[in-house]
Amino acid sequence: MDFSWTTGWEKAAADDDEAESAPAPAPPAPSPQEAAESMILVPGPRVVLSGLMRGDCRADDSVLFINAGGSATEGCEPSSKLSEDSFFEGGDAIETSEDIVEGGDYPSLYHSARYGNFSYKIDGLAPGDYFLDLHFAEIVNTYGPKGIRAFDVLVQEEKANTLTHILSELDVYAVVGGNRPLQVRDIRVTVESDSAIVINFKGVRGSPMVCGICIRKRVAMAVTDMVTEGNVLCKRCSAHTGNSPLQTRTSKLISKYEKQIEELTNQCNMKSDECYMAWSSVESTNQELERLKIELHQKVMQSDNIEQVVDRQADQLRSVSQKYENAKKLWAAAISNLENKIKAMKQEQTLLSLEAHDCANAVPDLSKMIGAVQTLVAQCEDLKLKYYEEMAKRKKLHNIVEETKGNIRVFCRCRPLSKDETSSGYKCAVDFDGAKDGDIAIVNGGAAKKTFKFDRVYMPTDNQADVYADASPLVTSVLDGYNVCIFAYGQTGTGKTFTMEGTERNRGVNYRTLEELFKIAEERKETVTYSISVSVLEVYNEQIRDLLASSPSSKKLEIKQASEGSHHVPGIVEAKVENIKEVWDVLQAGSNARAVGSNNVNEHSSRSHCMLCIMVRAENLMNGECTRSKLWLVDLAGSERLAKTDVQGERLKEAQNINRSLSALGDVISALATKNSHIPYRNSKLTHLLQDSLGGDSKALMFVQISPSNNDVSETLSSLNFASRVRRIELGPAKKQVDTAELQKVKQMLERAKQDIRLKDDSLRKLEDNCQNLENKAKGKEQFYKNLQEKVKELESQLDSKMHSQITSEKQQNELFGKLKEKEEMCTTLQQKIAEESEHKLRLQQQSESEIKELELKLKEQEHHRSVAESKIKELELKLKEQEHHRSVAESKAMEIGQELLETQRTEAMLQIKPRDLENNLQERTTLQDTNMILDSTNCMRVASTPGEAKAHLLTREEAMSEKEQHILRSSDSMNKKVTNNSSIVGAPEVVNEKKRKGDARNSSIGGELENQPVGSQNASRKRSLQGEPRLKRKSTEPLKNPGRVTATSKTAAATHKTGPVTRATRQQPAVNKTRGWVR
């Protein structure tokens, strides 16, 4: 959030009228630097719009540098030694491989970042003050827009338990753009003992993101200057000396700018408080505006809802009125129709009454009629018994006929050539010349034809109805209680599934069989009740799968044998079907769940044996006999050889299991044909399931499907050979010689019995129907007349209720129209109020925006003045640093000259032995003492800015001079002993006075010479004065062995102390006289 600094909320409030009359000028767009600095909420930190450089982080300052979201890196520079991302809580690490513009010396720092809502807790730091640097870069939303990511940064010192808001709504992209670095440096933090630094990143819009965190030591600048107001305290004599004009001016400027800085800081704090108050008021105004906007939106929504309700009610009213008009017309038409019908019914009633009277007259005597009916009932009972006997004979004869045809019959069906086979040039290899007699021949190249004999041969032109017509007699056996099995055999692609299942428009054997079952069951429903249930399963890889199960079960299905000898599969779904539609749904569900695959022979090849089991439970209502039969409709998998399909993997395993089960079926067929005592039903799941329907009293029908193409001759011959083996079951030579004449007689007797039964039934049924029709007609007419009267009454009552409802609806319509008008008036008033409130809020918002703009302008002016003052202070600091630099250079030259002087003095002390030279040395020391006083006063002013360095130089200088003076004193003592032996004690004061006079003259000459000497010569004289000073002090404090020498020394020290004020006075004279002096 951008905080705009103002000059005072009170003044802005006072200038509201002026702001309304004259709109404030639009402020200039802030620079990226200013935009970033406006997001900083504490003084001290600064913003850098570039990457990290080598000089930004020195070895003695750097404590910890965290590569957020990245790994540790090693380098020569301290800034290049980045530690891996640690100390964090929450967030995710992200990286980018794009180039970082202006990334500095270490652009890799900005290739990774920590992203999300997270915080850092950095512990293990030594107590003290630190600088915190944060590195940012927008590496996710590199194309913006502005404002897509804004977040706050808060720093908490753990023991303080307070969060300091450092950055507010920082938008990196708005400041520098995408893939560009941004640094916030010099955030001040303090660490106490056993505490940590907590940095919290809080998202305002989007998720926060940081690339690096650097912690540096903060070096405190110690203030050791001993400068007072207008004076400098001398380190040597503790005397207050006057400042030079430049120093005085500098100190005044410094104090002046410090006061200005303090005032500006106070003003800035005051303006920040005022800005915060203004911002809070603006926020409250914005919140109030938002609240009013929400209320306005709610009012608009309410008005819209009211309008919608009114429109809806109006539509309902119109629809009700239209319905009423339509109903009114319909009821009028219905009433007219009913009146016409009533008239016609009255006419019919009169006619029926006349017919009833005629019938009553035509009916003979009632007793005769009763006798005739009783005789008819007796005849009916006799006919029923004969009918049951004939039915039993019919069943027996039907089964005899079926058994004469053979228990297992084989039908051969050949499909037509496909388009692909015709286009590939394949020809028909099947000869259908003897198809009517059941013969079929196969032409195999140049070899002779091979002929096969079957019960029925279907040509490619025969349809599904023709095929089923020969299989339908077996359906009757199922209803009579026999187990029946119908299965289709042949290679893949020969039409087995088409024959058994068919399509929705061209049904197969399965559907037609069930349809025939329901048809016959409907015909026999008066004498026999049937319950039909269907199960669909498949044998896939020698495993039984229930195709009607809603979800596949992991439990294997096994075949069990019941106590009565039948076989069943526990757990399989048996769907009870009541009509043919349910049958088709069950067949479709099973067909869709069947395993299908592709191979070289057929793209959609059935890879399992599909078995449809129809369970029929019958109960004879006449004699109570119950039967339970089973019909198996089996669509076998393809019988082609493995070499032809060329399959691998899972398809190979499927083909092997299919061939194994078909081989087991062939073994069962062979055992049945040869009448073996053991039939291997259990060698396969297929034969085990069909054990009840193969052999014994069961009946079986096999469809062998063949291909007419000469490309499939080998598979066709294999299928026909297998079918021939099946046909030989129960068809020995003796059974083929059936007496057809006797069979014809039996058929004729059966037909005559059926015709007699039909004639008797028809005559009986006609008599009964005539009686019942006469009675029912009379009753029906009466009941119909009563119903018509009741309907007329109901229609009249409904008409009355409709009229009443129409009246009430008209009243409601009038009330709704009134309410609608009231609501429209309320909506108009609400819209006017809302418009007025919105205009008032817009005015308030414009006023607040103009005030904020004025405050921003004033804040920028204050910041400009402050920057100017800071620039002036920096210039003064640079000048002071230059002066200090010149002073340090002069002192270094003075030290060099002092060292040279020490060496020369040592050589003079060893060579000069005469008293006269000693006197000259004493005179030089007095002059050096005077010059030392002068140089001390001047140097104290110059060295005031760097007292620590001056003090160090003086201490070293005094130690060196004290050592030199001790050496000179020792040599002078030895020489003084020799002089005292040759001279008297009385002459000592004269010598001292003469030395005093010479010292005064030399001091005056040195004072005049110092002004004209360069800096190097002045420093040399200053060094000599420093060397002479400790010797004088030592003479005044240490006792001497020669009493006469003590008197001279004390007088000399006294004279030296007396000349001190004179030297101070003469120090200021060279500025006036400017004379040039010479030193001997």
Curated annotation (Swiss-Prot):
Pfam families listed in its UniProt record: Kinesin, Malectin
Q: Where is the Kinesin motor domain?
A: 407-729
InterPro entries for the chain: Kinesin-like_fam, Kinesin_motor_CS, Kinesin_motor_dom, Kinesin_motor_dom_sf, Malectin_dom, P-loop_NTPase
- GO cellular-component term (any): microtubule cytoskeleton
| Coiled-coil spans in chain | 247-355, 736-893
Q: Which residue ranges have biased composition labelled Low complexity?
A: 1047-1059
UniProt record, GO biological process:
microtubule-based movement; microtubule-based process
- Alphabetically ordered keywords of this record: ATP-binding, Coiled coil, Microtubule, Motor protein, Nucleotide-binding
Superkingdom of the organism of origin: Eukaryota
Please list the residue ranges that the record marks as compositionally biased, kind Polar residues: 971-985
According to the UniProt entry, its GO molecular function terms are: ATP binding; microtubule binding; microtubule motor activity
Q: At which positions is ATP bound?
A: G490, Q491, T492, G493, T494, G495, K496, T497
- Do the record's keywords include ATP-binding? yes
Residue segments, region Disordered: 1-35, 960-1080
Q: Where is the composition biased (Basic and acidic residues)?
A: 960-970
- Member of which family? Belongs to the TRAFAC class myosin-kinesin ATPase superfamily. Kinesin family. KIN-14 subfamily.
* The protein's name: Kinesin-like protein KIN-14E
Source organism of this protein record: Oryza sativa subsp. japonica
